[in-house]
Amino acid sequence: MRIDTSALCDIYSDQVDVVEPIFSSFGGASSFYGKITTVKCFENNGLIAEVLEEEGEGRVLLIDGGGAVRRALIDAELAKLAVDNGWQGIIVYGAVRQLDVLETLDIGIHALAPIPVGAEDADIGEVDTPVNFGGVTFFPEDYVYADLTGIILSPELLDLNELAE
């Protein structure tokens, strides 16, 4: 189902938080939504790989990379792993790389910027902890909705059938 964050904001204005418009879309899917799983790490992606090995149906991986854009936290290999395991999307408060591959994959990917330098492969960081960026605090198990217009957050699953009316 196509997500329209503008319409969701109109319908659920008192229930959603809007993430500051600092992200760009790099994946092949223009919209996505799901329950959040968080990873907090800095310039390393070992924990990201571990989480993406899990079943991702109905889930979005939200990565707090501290806003650093010196090393890419998501590359083609990790994005393909996410697709293979059914993840709906990835949001990176940091950088990504290998855009020519990312844009062909059936997954939504939002990040701050691209850079060709890869991250370290260390398992340093935290999983499923609240993170704050873009003017919003994200809690594990919140729901995130993203399209080319923006990213919104809700503590509860929104009724997407409202979009069809």
Swiss-Prot record:
Reply yes or no: does the keyword Isomerase apply.
Answer: no
**Keywords assigned:** Cytoplasm
**Top-level division of the source organism's lineage:** Bacteria
Its biological purpose: Globally modulates RNA abundance by binding to RNase E (Rne) and regulating its endonucleolytic activity. Can modulate Rne action in a substrate-dependent manner by altering the composition of the degradosome. Modulates RNA-binding and helicase activities of the degradosome.
Q: Name its cellular compartments.
A: Cytoplasm
Q: Which residues form a coiled coil?
A: none
Name of this protein: Regulator of ribonuclease activity A
Glycoprotein in keyword set: no
Q: Which NCBIfam families match?
A: NOT-MenG, PRK09372.1, RraA_entero
Family from the record:
Belongs to the RraA family.
